[in-house]
């Protein structure tokens, strides 16, 4: 399944707020999940499916990419769900978004694809690049790019940057301090349901 490029409002009406996809928050429609005993199995599947879709649309990844992340998380030591979230949160496009350099993850991905982002002084044009502690992230020295970033930073600094990241507004440089903990995730999600959804595939 390819990356979603359709109307974003339609997605958040169905799944709820997804700040990585869009900063819009329209009225949500009431859930139509049937809670009767006869449909319990179907309802539980749908709940897991929707949690999985939240991750996919929020981080802007394909079905195959998400499945690969689940497989990596399963092989690592620790909580599979928490490790899965850490893998997604440490993607370069997401780190740029969480630093406040862009209003959405698709916007961050565009900066990376257009070779505007430096990691430790080197151009990185792979949005899925996995950031690690002590990585420095900044914009390439281009007036247009810097103007866009400065405008975004000024607006989004009112939102608290998570503790695992730091942004130096004078140097216009972000720093990954450490691997984030569960409390720093910028999305309301039940990752255990996602792991359960993939239990037969990963």
From Swiss-Prot:
Record-annotated S4 RNA-binding domain positions: 90-153
Stretch forming the signal peptide: none
Key word Ion transport present: no
Listed PROSITE patterns: RIBOSOMAL_S4, S4
Swiss-Prot/TrEMBL keywords: Chloroplast, Plastid, Ribonucleoprotein, Ribosomal protein, RNA-binding, rRNA-binding
Family matches, as SMART domains: Ribosomal_S4 (SM01390), S4 (SM00363)
Family per similarity comment: Belongs to the universal ribosomal protein uS4 family.
The protein's name in its UniProt record: Small ribosomal subunit protein uS4c
